[in-house]
From Swiss-Prot:
It comes from Mycobacterium ulcerans (strain Agy99). Residues 171-190 have a biased composition (Polar residues). Keywords: Hydrolase, Nucleotide metabolism, Nucleotide-binding. The active site is at E129. The keyword Aminoacyl-tRNA synthetase does not apply. This is dCTP deaminase, dUMP-forming.
């Protein structure tokens, strides 16, 4: 069940759904707008010959923060990691779905490539996978609305929410754009 604006406010007021900082004006009919933080991770295209999800590649990305008051410029065909300004905390019976903003999609900005699902129990900033599919650079302003988070009520609380021992919650408590940790639980078929 997708939560309405009324249900979202009730979950936030009850302290079950955490959004910090929270701005009530960002609550939409069935989602909460999320804003862009000021930190990004750009890919170092000369450090490795290829990307291998089975290997730890610490120098694959570098942290970048634009000068205060300046935007980050995302060039055509470029892919970078960003994050939400807000920290989210979901209880064991709520999950999230991150979606892009229609107005930004119409400019050629993709907010996430594949990882739009937020597990019940997650706590932290949401990492954004930002791509420019337009033919011109796009300026990304820290604090701008970058997407919307829909909250879904599970039919029953998760038995092992994200962050529980044994679940392999690699990104619990993440701060800012967090690079891939796929190597930590990579499985190859034999």
């Amino acid at each position: 069940m997708l939560l309405s604006d009324r249900d979202l406010r009730a979950e936030i007021s009850a302290g079950r759904l955490g959004i910090d900082p929270f701005d009530d004006s960002l609550v939409q009919p069935s989602s909460v707008d999320v804003r862009l933080d000021c930190m990004f991770r750009v890919f170092n295209n000369t450090r490795y010959t290829h990307i291998d999800p089975a290997q730890r590649q610490d120098e694959l990305t570098s942290a970048v923060e634009p000068t205060k008051g300046d935007p980050f410029v995302l060039h055509p065909g470029e892919f970078v990691l960003g994050s939400t300004l807000e920290i989210f905390s979901l209880p064991g019976d709520l999950a999230g779905r991150l979606e892009g903003k229609s107005s930004l999609g119409r400019l050629g900005l993709l907010t996430h490539s594949t990882a739009g699902f937020i597990d019940p129990g997650f706590s932290g900033h949401i990492t954004l996978e930002l791509s420019n599919v337009a033919n011109l650079p796009i300026t990304l302003w820290p604090g701008m609305k970058i997407g919307q988070l829909c909250i879904l009520k599970l039919t029953s609380p998760s038995e092992h929410p994200y962050g529980s021992s044994g679940v392999g919650s690699k990104y619990q408590g993440q701060r800012g754009p967090t690079p891939s940790r796929s190597y930590q639980n990579f499985i190859r078929s034999t």
